[in-house]
């Protein structure tokens, strides 16, 4: 079967969908040597190798088109020009778009990955321009696609409930956790990362794009309440690049009695994440909605206990290996943090359970699920 995958998100996005695409397609390249794959890249070429540095196998080829991704997006999704993807990517039997939208197709069967429906479930947390675009593009994409992929059963249920996608048309392909996410034992590496990001000696870690959906304002409020209840030595570190309405997060930190206890190191490079997780006393992930939620599992893989929101796909991802709380309850979040930091037995149980839980999610399993979805698409 000739399969074309839009690899552009892997080149344009360092985290999130970019990381998902790199991990999944890298594992697929290691798994499948029978089908013929084209990696469609708009405007730029990938490196010479796959995600693990090895060469792409002979059944994978890269097709770079001179159009920038932004211009293609305008042509396909805003102007709705009838420009079939095959005209740019070459003849193919199946075209997979891993980033919510699906271009016009002449004969190929379409597969689209919808990572979440946050633009419908928590619309107040989405950039209005992006929300308006997704509200137009995603319903059409899932309608035209032969198969729709979701990162979790929670997102699959949302697709069925909110967009009417038949359950039999959806395949769930969870993300994997890379083997490099493990407890870092090298003191020099830990010291280097601590110095690079000016991290305090002890801290609670929050990680994600600084935007309303990640719920960092309530995390800051919970931390302030925690310090009023029972002052603890841990600072609060919120790492991530600025997103939509990020200024409100900084403003909330300044409003607190001891803003110097709240640190914003900015975007953290991928290679530094295992050390960052390892250095933290606890990882807090109070997001209002997630299609899957990779960071809590990465933290678990690094031996860090996790407190996590109990909404959307997060209970499905973390199971009983995290302390689950209501993301909208500041007092409950503060109480959960206090328990997590103060109860040694609870911490030990969550560390052990977390390591086991994270080990259940591998990119090789995800690639096997993707290949099964491709086979179903071609039936």
Question: How should each PLM-predicted stretch be described?
Answer:
Residues 1-379:
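Carbohydrate transferase catalytic cores enriched for Leloir-type hexosyltransferases
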